[in-house]
């Protein structure tokens, strides 16, 4: 009888410890996220409004901040469409064709994931800078790449290149070629097949890649910092402006710009979640 009671107590203790373990893990996770993300993000918002709403609006009117916003949006407008077109073309080549160097192309697409953005910026400087391979040719034709927006655009395009291709490739491989072959049999040409058959099947994964590309392009710091020189009012995107304003002890202005970047990140996160849910439903349907 005593042994039975001891066994019951041991079993109860094990059950209690098992029930406490998930709660402990949840608590640790929430504490970690709170310390690393939530509290710092909340502090940015508080500091941005430390001078009140009028001070926040005044900071938004800062000429250098507005120029940084304009340049940040310009980088997005240039890089996102180009990387979307490249991503679609590369995805079709990899998923639909067999050719020498296919594995190499896939590795090159993944290169921006593994290489440091600072190294990427340095690569662009060594190619297009005054002492670079193409520097003398560009200078003789009065074409400025480094310390100007074209170099910033090249850096942004490089770091945000893989996302559309990497999202569309598995989608194309999953849907196969049956529908495209059927459309071709019925007399549709290549463009008609793409617009009416293929694109509707990959649109959500493509949009998901576009959202990731946009987030990466607008938030890039390292590569753009190297090629731009971070000249206030001329070659500063929002991330560069945040750093420079903070170093110049314009803390409220810096937090205002950081809050704008945080707002962009929040919008991106919401769109990402919506597209993840949509692509999940689409995969279950297929």
From Swiss-Prot:
Q: Name one GO cellular component term.
A: plasma membrane
Domain ABC transmembrane type-1, by residue range, is: 69-272
Q: Which residues form the signal peptide?
A: none
Share what the entry says about its subunit structure, partners included: The complex is composed of two ATP-binding proteins (CysA), two transmembrane proteins (CysT and CysW) and a solute-binding protein (CysP).
Which family does the similarity line name? Belongs to the binding-protein-dependent transport system permease family. CysTW subfamily.
Q: What does this protein do?
A: Part of the ABC transporter complex CysAWTP (TC 3.A.1.6.1) involved in sulfate/thiosulfate import. Probably responsible for the translocation of the substrate across the membrane.
Q: What name appears for this protein in its UniProt entry?
A: Sulfate transport system permease protein CysW
Its ancestry begins with: Bacteria, Bacillati, Cyanobacteriota, Cyanophyceae, Synechococcales
